[in-house]
Amino acid sequence: MKKGIHPEMKLITVKCACGAEHKFYSAKENVRIDVCSSCHPFYKGAGAAGMIVDTEGRIEKFKKKYNLD
C-alpha cells in the first residue's frame, strides 16, 4: 500500500437512538444511527416469527390458486 494516501482509522462510538453505544474502527467521526442490533425487532426475537405477515390473505389466495389446501 502507498503511504500517506489512506485515511487514518480511529476508534469511534456509534450511538443509537435507543441509547446503545457500539465501538468500531472507522475513518469517520462519531456517528448517530436510528436503529441498531440492540433495538431492531429482528434481533430482539420478533424477527423470525414476525417476518411473515399475511395482512391481505395472500397465502390463502396462493393456496387456492394452486389447489394446495
Curated annotation (Swiss-Prot):
One of its GO terms (cellular component) is ribosome. The keyword Ribosomal protein applies. One of its GO terms (biological process) is translation. Its cofactor is Zn(2+). Binds 1 zinc ion per subunit. One of its GO terms (molecular function) is rRNA binding. Keywords: Metal-binding, Ribonucleoprotein, Ribosomal protein, RNA-binding, rRNA-binding, Zinc. InterPro entries: Ribosomal_bL28/bL31-like_sf (IPR034704), Ribosomal_bL31 (IPR002150), Ribosomal_bL31_A (IPR027491), Ribosomal_bL31_sf (IPR042105). Zn(2+) binds at C16, C18, C36, C39. The keyword Phosphoprotein does not apply. Binds the 23S rRNA. Part of the 50S ribosomal subunit. Belongs to the bacterial ribosomal protein bL31 family. Type A subfamily. PANTHER family: 50S RIBOSOMAL PROTEIN L31, CHLOROPLASTIC, LARGE RIBOSOMAL SUBUNIT PROTEIN BL31C. This is Large ribosomal subunit protein bL31. It comes from Thermosipho africanus (strain TCF52B).
